[in-house]
Amino acid sequence: MESYRNGFTCGAFDLLHPGHVHFIHEARKRCDFLIVGLHTDPTIDRPESKNKPIQSVFERYLQLDGLSCVDLIVPYDTERDLVNMMATLDIQVRFVGSDYDGKKITGEDICDQRGIEVSYIPVSYTHLRA
């Protein structure tokens, strides 16, 4: 029986740009079904270090929904919501940008407890410039 891998990534995806799209496509190549957590407003938990999104959550949802590589979008408000989502969704791999390698990520303990692989996708924008 072949293994079916559900993947997960998350972010605010404000002003969706080619780097976001490339990252999401790369994540989808590495799993069978990709769930994207959409952070509604990062300033709820971290007003001192994050900016309020320019686009509405509805606009960002529609843009993500237009990507063929996104299978499911789950909006969330807080980091606690993210942890709860990761504790309940059937996911086998979480995709994170390589810029987070070596850093503590939200839900890392849930990944350890549930045996969810954390896969770092290289983040480089130089190949996107022509």
Predicted segment positions?
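N-terminal catalytic cores of NTP/NDP-binding nucleotidyl/phosphoryl-transfer enzymes
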Residues: S3-T40
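Short, surface-exposed acidic-centric catalytic microdomains
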Residues: F23, D32-L67
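Proline-aspartate-enriched helix->loop->beta-strand connector
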Residues: M85-M86, D90-F95
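Short hydrophobic/charged patches on amphipathic alpha-helices used for structural packing
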Residues: Y61, L82-V83, A87
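Short secondary-structure boundary segments
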Residues: L38, D77, G97-D99, P122-V123
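Short acidic amphipathic segments
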Residues: Y61-E79
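Short, structured coil segments at secondary-structure junctions
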Residues: S68-C69, L89-D90, Q113-R114
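Conserved small/polar residues in nucleotide/adenosyl-binding loops
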Residues: T126-A130
